[in-house]
Amino acid sequence: RIADLKAAGWYSGDVHVHANLFAQDLIKPADVLAVGRAEDLNVLNILPCNDPRTTLISDLQFFTGGPDPVSDENHIVYYNEEMRNDLYGHVGFLNLKTFVEPAYFGFPHSPHPYDAPGNFPQVEAAKRQGAFVSYVHPGLPSEFPIDIALGLADTIDVMSQVDERNSLPM
């Protein structure tokens, strides 16, 4: 390594991981930890979210409201949440104690087919429990300017793994 960032007080992490979204095999917390160790990541935030083709919320069975028991002194595996609406934007909730429901809305084939109530109530519910709120997937339509103005959004992604051309000009 060129530098020992941990010795300088820095920790590496990935705050937007989907372990089992579209996965063919079940990826368990120990598997996530193994990948994190291989990538030298100290913090792994897994974001359970809805599969847009079904009503399944991937990884919800691993949500505990705190670091997963596989975590150790150098690695934190934490199942949190990505709340999704394709009109208002996708939002990552980190440091959750309780999963925020509904976790998605505006998907016509689901129990939550309409674009209501908007992201604000879910974001507010996450903040009440001490969550860090991050708007993810730049380029999607989003209500993040409103939530930022109201003091509810902590950050927004500026780059996405799926749309680099539209992310970079932002």
Predicted regions and their residues:
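Extended, charged catalytic domains and RNA/DNA-binding interfaces, predominantly
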Residues: 1-170
